[in-house]
């Protein structure tokens, strides 16, 4: 060893050492805590009168019958021998080394004799003594205190492999006796090189958490980190820093005896809690030291002493330095175990209402904080999930910590029904924390700090805890996971595989969803960190997603998406306006300018853009009815023309897919009229058409007469299709004029795509402005017109209109109130139109909406087997008060293994297929006829409770085809008597119905 230490470029460093008698505890603490380096006190046993007590003769005389637990260890086979007593091991050591068999048995982890413990406590300084007041373990209840005072008896060649002491504890090792020329070599890696040491031992086939490999000194010489070495002899007292990898080998011809113990100090506790515990939990090693309980009981002890102490008799600043880290750790513990359910939306919850927390159950028994997680063996401080069905060896149920449950780990048989349990009321602990903060605040004030400075210290401390625990605490995530475990699987945006919802995070910007596998394996992000955040911008929004949809959208991102200003489009302003406010995609009754956003649709079209940057950037859009090519020519021509030969609604359906408009001249004289007046019921049928994709409205409007250049930006898709709507109103005349009257006067607007300019004066204004229609314009026009604010146009209808004036519902809000989404608005528009137009047709087939393979499975099924269904309706479910669904009349469209109910034969219930991201088995629902709503019966409260995904799929259906609307009178008279047969297992669909039928 001496040669290795002196070798050129050697990474071996002799440990710092000083005499025991002249070295203060502060120096030792500075080395092992602040520097993370080992330290040695020499001559510790010098002058001890009873040094002869630490001999094999003493052990043979007093403790010969003492049973050795898992000792001695055979260093050759790496196994612990069983059934040995002290006299057996001493007899083995008295045999000459050449004759010993096995060759190397190491007496490790032997319980320390009581006499030795008492003598050491008497002789050593309190800062070093086992379970003294400086050892925080002593503050725990007796039943929680671990016994770490152990004896090690070794001969030449025995060793302890490289390892880390558990939970970041401080290791102290004193050689109390040895034969002549017997010693031990220590190899200790500084704390700061912990990760490098873990990798180094791992590369050599070792595991420092399981003491599996001793690396030869010659091999350690080439390690990429410094190694502190020391030759330990009797009286040498070695202090090992927390989280330090170290190994020991006994050398020399004789036998050496060492006494070792571990402790937790005030300065090492933060290292234990924040650094060591996560590693210990990942390795599933039992927490020998209950660090969380240590922090709690130590803080209670100190706070109690402070309350009963006169501040003038103590050094307040020293007490503050002691309390501050303890208070932060205890606050962090309580915050981690707090279940705090925020309002949606956030990355781990996409608009869904998480149910309120039920009261916790209490653990029975007098002992508290004595339970461990049955998966990772980590300490359970106060709260956990508990399976009452599965029993452990002690007859108790299984416990699972919040860290495991938040990762989807729990009882494999009863995960969904695990219950929450606690030892102490969480609210009681929070009150205790508040009282501790008050004491801490008084100490700060007594130290001479100003009130503002005191408040800043408290605020920074609490904010730091909130940041460490995340927007969603670990307990909150675990609560979400258990709740999500009983729900349907959700498809990942990128890989399109289905996962349980607890393995999915949602983009708070575009609602795209990504699974944990894609987040971790493809994009290299920490899923556990992302799901605790309050917002997250996904890889689609950042342009990093490599899925086919995002790639195709990226290829088309060179096309301009949005033209926001009337001057850009060559459209005249409303001359009756004196306001400077411009409104995009909105119909306004306050005399504001109306600007039109035009979206370029890239679905099933070829877009060729020729851009000529001359004087004015006006838009010429030449659309030819003989093909689907959309040619956008940007010239300096002030007049924009539309050449079209479309003369039917079907032609307009194709036209609506091209979504690029300027100012249009219509060369077809067969135009449609609609007299739309609040005082009559003369309404034509209304057709809702929808574009294939939505683009972000990010381009700002230009003002005045200046020209503007539109910068191509990347489109962002939204699941379920686009928000751009176009409606065409047809009536009895041959002019394309829509007459709207707010004050019993007619305002005639010439429309090409049903975009309405409303004026609140009594003059008749004719605006021949060709405009585009968007979802918001249609929805707002419906809500601001008499159809939604006054009595519906169908005088026989008594249904309450859905109000959207302020984009928020009126009246008493539901518990899960959230903002209206574009999909909600689309469905509301359909319902209002259905009510106001005497149940008119709401849609027609649109061949250019989406390829059929991109449609939801239920929409595809409806298109392929339309005759098997009775129409669209709404139904109540256990998980949601309102879900859109399709009434199934022909049971051959459901899986043949679906178990049916007798109430279907009796005519009390019907079979429906629900919209939503569900597995095929979960599509099928059996609902009571009293639990359904016809299409136009829903109200705003129920509609808000419906999720975005099922509504988006319903939106796809209406944009793809003209679906039937289920009528209650038809449902009331219907039953499945002729389609069901009885088998031994129950009722099922007759097998003959599946002949020549497509099964889901």
UniProtKB/Swiss-Prot annotation:
UniProt keyword Zinc-finger present: yes
Localization per record: Nucleus
What is the predominant subcellular site recorded for this chain?
nucleus
Biased composition of type Low complexity is found at 574-647, 660-683, 700-710, 732-751, 760-789
Task: List, alphabetically, the GO terms of the cellular component aspect.
Answer: nucleus
Q: Name one GO molecular function term.
A: zinc ion binding
Q: Matching SUPFAM superfamilies, A to Z?
A: Clavaminate synthase-like
In the UniProt record, does the keyword Zinc-finger occur?
yes
Residue segments, region Disordered: 561-647, 660-818
Q: Where are the zinc fingers (RING-type)?
A: 492-542
ZnF (PHD-type) residues: 489-544
| Name of the featured protein | C-module-binding factor A
